[in-house]
């Protein structure tokens, strides 16, 4: 299903992944599919995370699951990104070097907070 671009599997450490290993997270590859497949409105956090993972992976970046309480994603084994709404803070990213928040419902970047829509230009 991943080769058909229906799902995206995320692992915590890609260096240790085996064929039989269970992924840490599974997202639909295209966030628009969530609106088609959910009988009610999909969880907005899942939509944001699916969109973010899709945009960066489509641009050729390696997207890993950052781990519990460490942010949402690790990009190219480097920066950690937490995805959330406009009020999302940096508490989950404490102690993480090169960490950023990709925030929905904001128009422009400030400090380490980047608008989620800006990642759409990577596609």
Whereabouts are the PLM-identified features?
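Active-site flanking residues adjacent to catalytic metal/cofactor-binding acidic residues
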Residues: 29, 81, 103
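Active-site-adjacent loop/helix micro-motif of nuclease/hydrolase catalytic cores
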Residues: 44-47, 86-95, 109-111
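Short, polar loop motifs at secondary-structure junctions
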Residues: 67-72, 84-90, 102-109
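Hydrophobic beta-strand segments of well-ordered beta-sheets in folded domains
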Residues: 77-80, 97-101
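Domain-level recognition of nuclease-like catalytic cores that cleave nucleotide substrates
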Residues: 107-123
